UniProtKB/Swiss-Prot annotation:
The protein's name in its UniProt record: NADPH-dependent 7-cyano-7-deazaguanine reductase
Task performed by this protein: Catalyzes the NADPH-dependent reduction of 7-cyano-7-deazaguanine (preQ0) to 7-aminomethyl-7-deazaguanine (preQ1).
Family under the similarity heading: Belongs to the GTP cyclohydrolase I family. QueF type 1 subfamily.
Organism: Bdellovibrio bacteriovorus (strain ATCC 15356 / DSM 50701 / NCIMB 9529 / HD100)
Pathway note: tRNA modification; tRNA-queuosine biosynthesis
Amino acid sequence: MKKKNGRDSKELADFALGESQTNYPETYAPEVLEAFDNKNPGKIAWTTFVCTEFTSLCPKTRQPDFAKIFINYIADKKMVESKSLKLYLFSFRNHGDFHEDCVQTICDDLVKLMKPKYIEVIGEFTPRGGIAIYPYANYAAKDKFFQELYKKRMSEYAPGKYSMELSKLY
């Protein structure tokens, strides 16, 4: 018998996606992240998420900082569920941390959740005081191929290299 959907209802039962009431966390909340099984763990395929409205707080002034966050990853056995990722990123809005720390925290939390083959997180923060900050964090599994990818991407990184113009999204 052929399934109507690619996933059966048991696989989807525990996800927040589709709930009638969405609870938005008011503080940093890595516990809202959810993962699902990758149906193709033997493949090498990129997944990219673009968050165009990321907000956090400067830890010193408590002024808001705005950014675009780009997450590029190659999944292994688990993938991140997109609504949970949205809620997680939204949880930074009252979180006071420096740009570089926010990006590294996002990378570390996603590595802990999914254990991907490779992941990189790029933050393109709106300039304040005439200074633009574009932090980059990446991680690779121990496999030689992904370690080489890690080294290559890190050595070739430059602002805008692994992100995209928003005009391509809209």
